[in-house]
């Protein structure tokens, strides 16, 4: 009998300690209202590189490092970060932090397959001794990408999120 009373007491206590929804208000959403998509982070670009947002996701730059050759390739992508976005520029500025100092590099246009004449979606920094000596993997890439696209200058930071 004593155990039965103890059991009833414990169950009653558990029911009293439940969630209190008294502080939560219900907000009805008007019919036809749409929820705005939240900004999201892209993990990897179509070439397996790190994505850099240019503007308010108007464009993206994909940064790809070939550790064997120390070549850095930048791909200009559209707002979806999936399709090439060929631009008129002959170069893109790549600023990297090397030895705690910012260093500027010029990535030259190298037309990619499918790029129209006089436009490029691919830019490269190749055979650079500073990059060869200091950039060993993607984690060493810290800095920014600056590109002139359709008369507007876009700059995006190379950020590694862990």
Where are these regions (language model features)?
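Sec-dependent bacterial lipoprotein signal peptides
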Residues: 1-17
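Intrinsically disordered, low-complexity terminal tails/loops enriched in metal-binding residues
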Residues: 10, 17-162
């Amino acid at each position: 009998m004593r155990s039965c009373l103890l059991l009833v007491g414990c169950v009653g206590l558990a029911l009293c300690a439940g969630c209190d929804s008294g502080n939560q208000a219900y907000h009805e959403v008007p019919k036809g209202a749409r929820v705005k998509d939240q900004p999201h982070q892209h993990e990897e670009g179509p070439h397996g590189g790190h994505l850099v947002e240019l503007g308010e996701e108007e464009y993206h730059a994909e940064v790809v490092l070939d550790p064997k050759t120390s070549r850095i390739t930048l791909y200009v992508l559209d707002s979806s970060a999936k399709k090439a976005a060929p631009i008129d520029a002959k170069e893109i500025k790549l600023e990297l932090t090397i030895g705690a100092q910012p260093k500027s590099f010029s990535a030259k246009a190298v037309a990619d397959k499918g790029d129209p004449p006089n436009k490029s979606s691919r830019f490269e920094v190749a055979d650079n001794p500073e990059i060869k000596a200091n950039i060993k993997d993607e984690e060493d890439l810290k800095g920014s990408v600056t590109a002139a696209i359709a008369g507007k200058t876009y700059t995006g930071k190379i950020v590694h999120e862990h």
